[in-house]
Swiss-Prot record:
It comes from Xenopus laevis. The active site is at C2 (nucleophile), E129. It is found in: Chromosome. Coiled coil: none annotated. One of its GO terms (molecular function) is peptidase activity. Changing E129A: Abolished ability to mediate self-reversal of covalent cross-link with DNA. Ubiquitination of the hmces DNA-protein cross-link by rfwd3 may promotes its degradation. Belongs to the SOS response-associated peptidase family. Formation and reversal of DNA-protein cross-link depends on DNA context. Catalyzes formation of the thiazolidine linkage in presence of abasic sites in single-stranded DNA. Mediates the reversal of the thiazolidine cross-link in presence of double stranded DNA. Pfam families: SRAP (PF02586). The modification Thiazolidine linkage to a ring-opened DNA abasic site is found at C2. GO terms for cellular component: replication fork. This is Abasic site processing protein HMCES. Residues 26-51, 285-336 are annotated as: Disordered.
Length: 336
């Protein structure tokens, strides 16, 4: 399952984080589709029906473009099929935020866009999953293992992204045109697979994550890579890490740094943390721990318990984790 994500990077940083090499070996950052940066709002707590950054082939919008060229678009989470004939897309009766890989070639909802080559990569800092234990549900934040950088986001060149590695999930999209006319609605679904060994202790399903640019290239390039070959990329992966977070994330209206901040479970034992997660907990613990009765919320001293929602120019808590010096406050930049 994948029903809640965090995506806190500003639009320009999303583009930098998605840089790739084209067929000529040139490093490129995909551009946003015109007008879509205004549709995307960074958030620590994004739920279905929100607009989120999606990577896809430019050829879907420009027929003369090479299918290997990429573009960023803001799409609605929850696929609305092109054949939907209601005036209001919110009247869609089926939940389409996820699509099971084992039925993707059978259900008409997903079969049509799949065989039309409407493959996309859904971008996020990470996603949330809830573990059921003793009648309760404990949320976990799941993401790619991060490599800390010596550079600050403000110091990076356009083609030299050293910030957080975005989670890249395989998805399908479709385009619905209102029967009464108006702007077409682009929407997507996240493909899910059986959980890997790493994830199985939390949930039995996980998003189909594309690990590495070669997998992303093959999934997006519908002109060169057949549907059959593309589906071979859809499988569980082990290269993920996670940590428990506060139940404040349970309410989708909550949008603060507390949603992704690591907590230490003190009463009930959760799944064993990975090495990367343990390092992150140690880093956060060196900051300013705040104890509660049943768990401890660990946050940076610069972040209040209910920190402000991410701005389109903010780096967020995960970016602080990527700084080189553990336990040291981020140095202030000199005013020009």
């Amino acid at each position: 399952m994948c029903g809640r994500t965090a995506c806190t990077l500003a639009p320009d940083d999303v583009s930098k984080a998605c840089s790739y090499q084209d067929k000529q070996g040139r490093q490129k950052c995909p551009k946003w589709r015109d007008g879509d940066t205004d549709k995307y709002q960074p958030s620590y707590n994004k739920s279905p029906q929100s607009n989120n950054p999606v990577l896809l082939s430019l050829k879907h919008f420009q027929k003369d473009a090479d299918s290997s060229e990429r573009v960023l678009a803001a799409m609605r989470w929850g696929l609305i099929p092109s054949w939907f004939n209601e005036l209001d897309p919110s009247k869609m009766q089926y939940k389409t935020n996820n699509c099971r890989s084992d039925t993707i070639t059978e259900k008409a909802l997903y079969k049509a866009p799949l065989f039309k080559g409407r493959r996309c990569v859904v971008l996020a800092d990470g996603f949330y999953e809830w573990k059921r234990q003793d009648g309760e549900k404990q949320p976990y934040y799941i993401y790619f293992p991060q490599i800390k950088s010596e550079k600050f986001p403000e110091e990076q060149d356009m083609m030299d992204w050293n910030g957080q590695r975005l989670l890249t999930m395989a998805g399908l999209f479709d385009c619905w045109e209102p029967p009464s006319g108006g702007e077409p609605l682009y929407s997507y679904t996240v493909i899910t697979v059986d959980s890997s060994k790493t994830m199985n202790c939390i949930h039995d399903r996980m998003p189909a994550i594309l690990d590495g640019d070669e997998a992303i290239r093959k999934w997006l390039d519908f002109g060169e890579v057949s549907t059959q070959d593309a589906l071979k990329l859809i499988h569980p992966i082990e290269n993920i890490t996670y940590h428990p977070v506060s139940t404040v994330v349970n309410n989708s209206r909550n949008n603060s740094t507390e949603c992704i901040a690591a907590v230490i479970l003190t009463q009930k034992k959760g799944p064993a943390l990975s090495a990367s997660s343990k390092k992150m907990l140690e880093w956060l613990q060196n900051k300013s721990p705040k104890k509660e009765e049943s768990r401890s919320i660990i946050q940076s001293p610069k972040l209040s318990q209910f920190g402000a929602p991410p701005k389109k120019t903010s780096a967020g808590l995960m970016q602080q984790w990527l700084k080189k010096e553990d336990g040291e406050p981020s140095p202030k930049r000199a005013k020009k």
